């Protein structure tokens, strides 16, 4: 017993502070099938699995909020621009410092004669730092939309140039999204006749654009719209788009600069709910994405299943076993918390001594229940154990493969309470 007591005291040696590596953060703004008057905001750490930050997060004082596009400006503030109505000559603007609480700025009238429809504004920041919006316009007496660009005339994004058409992209194109690689502008745009998303390039933002992919060139099928692109950490590009006729939302990846694309997949948990969205990727927040490997069952990893925490082999889907190890919610100095990667905003916490996955409710009780001190492994100091922050004599351990917190008073308990953080 004395040996065990000495060993237990030894493991109280704290490990270095949690990893300071940055996890990329993907912020999504969208309207939904249930409402075109409210914006929802989601967050992801892998660009695939998104958790709700707030919904509704913003409701304009009047009109609609369709097609919200998000930008982080040089002032550190987040801005969205959006479609204000089915008919009209305005686009809307709102701002936020935290992506959750939004303030209406203004509706801007575009000075185009006989403008009847002003749809799908998308931010585009050029390599010279200029801020632009790509927008689809239709005037009275015409049957088709034409992509245009407007340019910010001041740093506060309150004054804008007159719309300039994108040569080579119209009429008959809508929902245009542009990225720039090197000196080339790459435009993804919906053909309103064939209902395909097509692809064109130019050496100038305003064109002329030359089509490189038309019809079903990428294999996504037709009756799709609202393309939005992000670059993933592995260098490949992801396009997300709205399969509006099927009521589904899709994504597809390209590893060869848009030459070919993977088969489209439905966006997990959000397909069938979100509509025409945009995603902003930022180099992110402190914390590493890791899996927790059991010391005495090395083929098993911690995972969540129906919001319960357990260890299992051959975890499927593997994302259930990936956690972002972040500075502790209750104490960021020498303590950690475990945030789910595929359910962002949900953390491992103890409840009646059993570990569960639960959404952070912002209370002090939650923060303490979800915080653990990472110490040298109770069975092997080269591994790691996790002592409860608010029940300091107890550690995360598995018992009958279920994760819980318990005092450690046996060699079996020491092995059950020891884990290794491994790359996903």
Regions of interest found by a model, annotated:
Residues 1-21:
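Secretory targeting and sorting signals
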Residues 22, 285-308, 324-354, 373-402, ...:
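Extracellular glycan-recognition/adhesion modules and their associated mucin-like linkers
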Residues 22-289, 324, 369-373, 378-384, ...:
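Carbohydrate-active catalytic/glycan-binding domains of CAZyme proteins
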Residues 30-38, 46, 296-300, 307, ...:
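Short polar catalytic/cofactor-binding loops
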Residues 205-206, 245, 255-258, 307, ...:
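Acidic glycine-/aspartate-rich tracts in secreted/extracellular proteins
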Residues 317-322, 363-374, 410-423:
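Short amphipathic alpha-helical linker/capping segments at the junctions of internal repeats
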